[in-house]
């Protein structure tokens, strides 16, 4: 029997086809990560040293707020304010506090936005950076208050402001109170306009919902990272509402640039220099 098997001309090996999920998840993620942009595994350290951009296909990975601040603000110059805000549950929404506490533990942040001021190549600026890992960067009363305070601080101190958006929109657990933040932040921006102070809006993936419908699209200059999802409602909801097929690439930064809704698309690796040039141009 064994002799017959060994002398057989038939293949003694079986090729096992690994499914896509196994291929993507079978590599130790401490050293490697799977890139959806180029369908390949990439050394994690190479991505981190490349501003969290894939060195093969230039796909921009999501960033937590402090990592983005480290990329944009001069080392040692960032001063945070309003980091110790207290939790608010205006509607007494069930289990809302428990959910917020879990995200605090996960992200080591108090809320979905980090605010403060620092310097970009020596130029002082106020900066707000939203954290998409904290309840999808949703805007509730605390996020709205922190952004409003930052805008007012910039106006009072004659400083420019940069807001980096990354959000799923208004926070549903706060209902109408979260929607009020849209008007609150938008109204605050008028104080900058009165003093001719620049507001630079940086859109990152994703920027949607109430954030898009308020301060994110009100910048004097609106910049986006490549291939960023920007919109109010999702494409499926829109198609079901209007009973029409949306154009290819709808709600991407490239589509919005073509239609004139944003001013420029900037690679993350060049973002700090572009922001510096804009700030230097408008420096008083």
Curated annotation (Swiss-Prot):
Main location, first listed in the record: cytoplasm
Protein name stated in the entry: Acetyl-coenzyme A carboxylase carboxyl transferase subunit beta
Catalytically driven reaction(s): N(6)-carboxybiotinyl-L-lysyl-[protein] + acetyl-CoA = N(6)-biotinyl-L-lysyl-[protein] + malonyl-CoA
Disulfide pairings: none
Family designation: Belongs to the AccD/PCCB family.
Cofactor or coenzyme needed: Zn(2+)
Note accompanying the cofactor annotation: Binds 1 zinc ion per subunit.
Subunit structure as annotated in this protein's UniProt entry: Acetyl-CoA carboxylase is a heterohexamer composed of biotin carboxyl carrier protein (AccB), biotin carboxylase (AccC) and two subunits each of ACCase subunit alpha (AccA) and ACCase subunit beta (AccD).
EC number of the protein: 2.1.3.15
Originating gene: accD
Keywords noted in UniProt: ATP-binding, Cytoplasm, Fatty acid biosynthesis, Fatty acid metabolism, Lipid biosynthesis, Lipid metabolism, Metal-binding, Nucleotide-binding, Transferase, Zinc, Zinc-finger
Record's subcellular location: Cytoplasm
Pathway where this protein functions: Lipid metabolism; malonyl-CoA biosynthesis; malonyl-CoA from acetyl-CoA: step 1/1
Domain (CoA carboxyltransferase N-terminal): residue spans on this chain: 31-284
Organism whose genome encodes this protein: Clostridioides difficile (strain 630)
Segments forming C4-type zinc fingers: 35-57
General function of this protein: Component of the acetyl coenzyme A carboxylase (ACC) complex. Biotin carboxylase (BC) catalyzes the carboxylation of biotin on its carrier protein (BCCP) and then the CO(2) group is transferred by the transcarboxylase to acetyl-CoA to form malonyl-CoA.
GO CC term, one of those recorded: acetyl-CoA carboxylase complex
BP-aspect Gene Ontology terms: fatty acid biosynthetic process; malonyl-CoA biosynthetic process
InterPro entries: AcCoA_carboxyl_beta (IPR034733), Acetyl_CoA_COase_Trfase_b_su (IPR000438), ClpP/crotonase-like_dom_sf (IPR029045), COA_CT_N (IPR011762), Znf-ACC (IPR041010)
Binding site for Zn(2+): 35, 38, 54, 57
